[in-house]
Regions:
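The alpha-helix within a helix-turn-helix
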Residues: 40, 51, 80
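Short alpha-helical "recognition helix" segments of helix-turn-helix
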Residues: 46-53
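Key DNA-contact positions within bacterial/archaeal DNA-binding proteins
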Residues: 48, 59, 88
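Long, compositionally biased
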Residues: 81-83, 107-136
């Protein structure tokens, strides 16, 4: 299975009429759950690793991975740190999961971007968040 690039998808969309768009709409949209499952696979992790290491409620985690529940933005940020994603990977994950991307003019988000760019651990990030009066990632 060949995953089309964004440019290929845009070119396809330009050429399609409404009927063919409606028939093929699922080719363009990836669910948050499917994307998170793919990220776990790419990092050679099982859902059980994520559940244990992030101390998630088992059924909630599986509902997220199946796409029947949307993860909170905080949970996505925790998952991103757990998987050691880059800033661009974080933004993509947040966008696909329909959550606000990190915005540098927001103090909380700026601290997260800083932590990412300086390879800080989640514990160090939580200390930094506490120092600036923001809630920790828990």
């Amino acid at each position: 299975y060949h995953m089309k690039s964004t440019d290929e998808l845009i070119n396809d969309l330009k050429k399609q009429d409404q009927t063919s768009f409606l028939e093929n709409e699922t080719d363009y949209v990836q669910s948050g759950g499917a994307y998170l499952s793919k990220l776990l696979k790419e990092h050679h992790l099982q859902p059980g690793n994520l559940i244990r290491d992030l101390e998630l409620e088992r059924s909630y985690a599986y509902q997220i991975l199946r796409g029947t529940r949307k993860p909170t933005r905080i949970l996505l940020l925790r998952i991103g740190f757990y998987l050691q994603l880059s800033l661009s990977e974080f933004q993509r994950m947040l966008s696909i999961c329909q959550r606000a991307i990190l915005y540098p003019r927001n103090r909380f988000d700026a601290a997260i971007i800083y932590a990412l760019e300086h390879n800080m651990s989640i514990d160090d990030l939580n200390d930094l968040l506490e120092e600036i009066g923001e809630p920790p990632l828990r």
